[in-house]
Amino acid sequence: LKFQELWKVEVVAMQVTPERMPALYLSHGAPPLADDPVWPGELAAWSAGLPRPKAILMVSAHWEEAPLALGATETVPLVYDFWGFPEHYYRVAYAAPGAPALAESVRKLLRAPGTPVQDVPDRGLDHGAYVPLVEMFPDADVPVLQISLPTLDPRRLMDVGRRLAPLRDEGVLIVGSGFFTHNLAALRHPGGGVPGWSAEFDAWGHEALAARDVDALLDFAHASPAGRLAHPRTEHFAPLFVTLGAADAAGDLDAGRSVIDGFWMGLAKRSVQFG
């Protein structure tokens, strides 16, 4: 289809009054996630229980760019942003339609309060986006737009999420994609056990989410046990704050729940849903 035809199809789809979509934060693993005996099934079961989205807005830990950037609005090649893996991981395809109407909605929601927005039309989906989407929406028939993390400041990211929250009432699934603990220097081999810092941070985060203790989550580096062991940098926890903002603005923090838990190579794969 031509760009103009894709735009018309997407606009019509988003004009249908849908139910409010949840907001998700998921741990996306790495390309070998597809070979795990359990994790792909957990992601597939999760998506099977969701309302069908009109479009998906992805915020991945693997794209930091300021000002906030909108990725491709038509199908372009994936970004294989990893090195040293077997060749078949570089042949994974996920040709989801672009989401130009969603991109325009994002521009309006963010620019109205004066937030600068830029377009990066050749930027495809990175592995933080497509690895989980392959398992959750394998037909690649839902339009997807990826946006960048414009900052790693948790409060500013929550504000971005709050501004994007109205999209949930237009059938848009907002997904923050990171990893609940992420310290690659301490990665364990399969079956190598779970390091204490990863288990402690995961338990703390689970309790903070259950208690809706947003202040503690915002200050995770100091409020949590082993915060900087769990996250030497903030980028894999950062997408959670966009999700929290989208949930908070819609009054859905009380409706949060963990959907996936456990560990993968010593890292916590906790994933949560609001609404």
Please name every model-derived segment:
Residues 24-25, 81-88, 136-145, 218:
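Short, basic/glycine-rich phosphate-binding loops at helix/coil junctions
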Residues 60-63, 122-123, 172, 177-180:
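Short, well-ordered beta-to-alpha junction loops that form the rim of enzyme active sites
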Residues 39-44, 88-92, 123-131, 157-160:
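Short acidic (Asp/Glu) patches
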Residues 108, 112, 143-144, 151-173, ...:
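Surface-exposed, charge/polar-rich loops and edge strands
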Residues 13-117:
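A short aromatic-anchored loop/beta-hairpin motif
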Residues 1-4:
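Short hydrophobic targeting helices and cationic amphipathic motifs
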